[in-house]
Swiss-Prot record:
PANTHER family (alphabetical): GTP CYCLOHYDROLASE 1, GTP CYCLOHYDROLASE I
PROSITE patterns reported in the protein's UniProt record: GTP_CYCLOHYDROL_1_1, GTP_CYCLOHYDROL_1_2
One example of a Gene Ontology biological process annotation: tetrahydrobiopterin biosynthetic process
Pfam families documented for this protein: GTP_cyclohydroI
Organism this protein belongs to: Hydrogenobaculum sp. (strain Y04AAS1)
Xref: SUPFAM superfamilies: Tetrahydrobiopterin biosynthesis enzymes-like
Metal-binding among keywords: yes
Protein name: GTP cyclohydrolase 1
Binding-site residues, Zn(2+): C73, H76, C144
Enzyme class: hydrolase
Pathway(s) per entry: Cofactor biosynthesis; 7,8-dihydroneopterin triphosphate biosynthesis; 7,8-dihydroneopterin triphosphate from GTP: step 1/1
GO molecular function terms listed in the Swiss-Prot or TrEMBL record: GTP binding; GTP cyclohydrolase I activity; zinc ion binding
Keyword Transport recorded: no
Catalytic activity: GTP + H2O = 7,8-dihydroneopterin 3'-triphosphate + formate + H(+)
Amino acid sequence: MIDKEKIIEGIKLFLEGIGEDITREGIKETPERVAKMWEEFEKERSFDFKLFEEYSNYSEMIIVKDIPFYSMCEHHLLPFFGKAHIAYIPNKKICGLSKLVRTVRAMALKPQVQERLTEEIADIVQKELEPMGVGVVIEAEHLCMSMRGVRSPGHCTVTSSLRGNFLSDIRTKEEFFKLIRQ
């Protein structure tokens, strides 16, 4: 649960700390806007991971690719954004495809690093579906590298997390990587 008042006070202190007049017309409502944004994010992080067991005989790879997302780098509080690809091989359970999209959104809507985001998505799919295997790939641009530091806009950082057949069977891994590139 978030503490809206602490967020408001923290943003006021931050703005004053960088020399802004917190009574200025364009800024005076910013602390409340930021708190409201984080409240909205918190609401989106909760969802029901509905399973469908009536398709228990399906045993080929299921992929949802090019899932757009945005997150916040926990080191600099700057956005990173891109797309995620999720695949799994069912073991008697499948989920509504939107649940994979919601999983990406839910895990991304908090201060995060891309490596952990990739692992958390794979963890949830593994826990909820108990599949034969899971593959997650995330491609993202980090504004903390584009706007500051090395100032390298347009880069793409790629992370992956593989479980089960995706890790142990080279053909499954190759099929996954080939399909997400098509």
